[in-house]
C-alpha cells in the first residue's frame, strides 16, 4: 500500500510514478531515472501491453493544494531481488508530475515535468 501526503501543489490531477533510481536532485529530479520497469512492459494502466511496475493511478490535488486521500496498492514487492523496489543500491523514487497521466502513451503518459520527488529506501 502506498499513501501519499503532499501540499502546495497545483489543484487537479497529476501523474505519479515510481522511478528506477533513489535520487531526487534539483532542479528537475531527472536523477530519479525512468519509470521502474523491470519487466520491460509498455507504459499505462490502460495499456494492454502494460503497465510499468511503477505506474500508478493519477493523484488528485484539491483546491487547497493538498492531496485528496491518495492510497493505492502496487503488486511490486518491497524487497526480494532486482524486480523489487529495494532490489538495487539506492532504492527507488516516487515522482509527482505537473499534468495528469493519460495511462497509455509511452514513456510517461504525457504527464509533463517532474514537480516533486521522494526517495523510497530501506529504513
Feature-to-residue mapping (PLM):
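N-terminal leader/targeting pre-sequences
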Residues: 1-13, 18-123
